[in-house]
Amino acid sequence: GAPDRLEMLLDKRVVAMADYDREHGTAYLQTAIMSVRFPGSPADAAAALNVHRNTYFYRMNKVRELFFIDLKDGDDRLALSFSASIMEGMEK
Protein backbone atom coordinates (compact mmCIF):
# COMPACT_ATOMS: atom_id res chain seq x y z
CA GLY A 1 0.00 0.00 0.00
CA ALA A 2 0.86 3.67 0.10
CA PRO A 3 2.65 3.56 3.49
CA ASP A 4 4.95 0.81 2.18
CA ARG A 5 5.85 2.91 -0.85
CA LEU A 6 6.54 5.91 1.38
CA GLU A 7 8.78 3.84 3.65
CA MET A 8 10.96 2.99 0.65
CA LEU A 9 11.74 6.71 0.29
CA LEU A 10 12.98 7.09 3.86
CA ASP A 11 16.69 7.38 4.57
CA LYS A 12 17.57 4.30 6.62
CA ARG A 13 19.79 6.34 8.94
CA VAL A 14 16.90 8.61 9.86
CA VAL A 15 14.65 5.61 10.52
CA ALA A 16 17.41 4.10 12.68
CA MET A 17 17.64 7.36 14.63
CA ALA A 18 13.88 7.42 15.26
CA ASP A 19 13.99 3.78 16.39
CA TYR A 20 16.97 4.49 18.65
CA ASP A 21 15.16 7.45 20.23
CA ARG A 22 12.09 5.30 20.90
CA GLU A 23 14.14 2.50 22.43
CA HIS A 24 16.50 4.65 24.52
CA GLY A 25 14.42 7.71 25.42
CA THR A 26 16.78 10.03 23.56
CA ALA A 27 15.94 12.99 21.32
CA TYR A 28 18.57 12.75 18.59
CA LEU A 29 16.10 13.02 15.70
CA GLN A 30 14.41 16.11 17.12
CA THR A 31 17.83 17.64 17.78
CA ALA A 32 18.95 16.96 14.21
CA ILE A 33 15.71 18.44 12.86
CA MET A 34 16.28 21.62 14.87
CA SER A 35 19.80 21.80 13.48
CA VAL A 36 18.32 21.86 9.97
CA ARG A 37 15.57 24.29 10.98
CA PHE A 38 18.08 26.72 12.51
CA PRO A 39 21.11 26.41 10.20
CA GLY A 40 24.23 28.06 11.53
CA SER A 41 22.59 28.93 14.83
CA PRO A 42 23.27 26.34 17.53
CA ALA A 43 22.00 28.78 20.17
CA ASP A 44 18.59 29.03 18.47
CA ALA A 45 18.43 25.26 17.92
CA ALA A 46 19.27 24.63 21.59
CA ALA A 47 16.69 27.20 22.70
CA ALA A 48 14.00 25.56 20.53
CA LEU A 49 14.82 22.25 22.24
CA ASN A 50 14.92 23.86 25.70
CA VAL A 51 18.41 22.47 26.30
CA HIS A 52 21.81 24.01 27.05
CA ARG A 53 24.09 24.59 24.06
CA ASN A 54 26.52 21.97 25.40
CA THR A 55 23.70 19.40 25.43
CA TYR A 56 22.86 20.34 21.85
CA PHE A 57 26.49 19.90 20.75
CA TYR A 58 26.75 16.58 22.61
CA ARG A 59 23.64 15.30 20.84
CA MET A 60 24.86 16.46 17.43
CA ASN A 61 28.15 14.63 17.98
CA LYS A 62 26.16 11.48 18.83
CA VAL A 63 24.11 11.91 15.63
CA ARG A 64 27.37 11.87 13.64
CA GLU A 65 28.87 8.98 15.64
CA LEU A 66 25.86 6.69 15.83
CA PHE A 67 24.09 7.36 12.53
CA PHE A 68 26.83 8.72 10.24
CA ILE A 69 24.79 11.81 9.44
CA ASP A 70 26.79 14.99 8.94
CA LEU A 71 24.42 17.92 8.82
CA LYS A 72 27.14 20.13 7.34
CA ASP A 73 26.65 17.99 4.21
CA GLY A 74 23.81 19.23 2.01
CA ASP A 75 22.75 15.73 0.94
CA ASP A 76 22.51 14.58 4.57
CA ARG A 77 20.48 17.68 5.50
CA LEU A 78 18.10 17.00 2.62
CA ALA A 79 17.79 13.31 3.52
CA LEU A 80 16.99 14.18 7.14
CA SER A 81 14.50 16.91 6.31
CA PHE A 82 12.73 14.84 3.64
CA SER A 83 12.58 11.64 5.68
CA ALA A 84 11.49 13.40 8.87
CA SER A 85 8.67 15.15 6.98
CA ILE A 86 7.42 11.86 5.51
CA MET A 87 7.63 10.11 8.90
CA GLU A 88 5.71 12.94 10.53
CA GLY A 89 3.01 12.69 7.87
CA MET A 90 2.77 8.92 8.30
CA GLU A 91 2.10 9.33 12.04
CA LYS A 92 -0.97 11.49 11.42
Task: Please identify what each model-predicted range represents.
Residues G1-K92:
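Cytosolic nucleotide-utilizing catalytic cores of signal-transduction proteins
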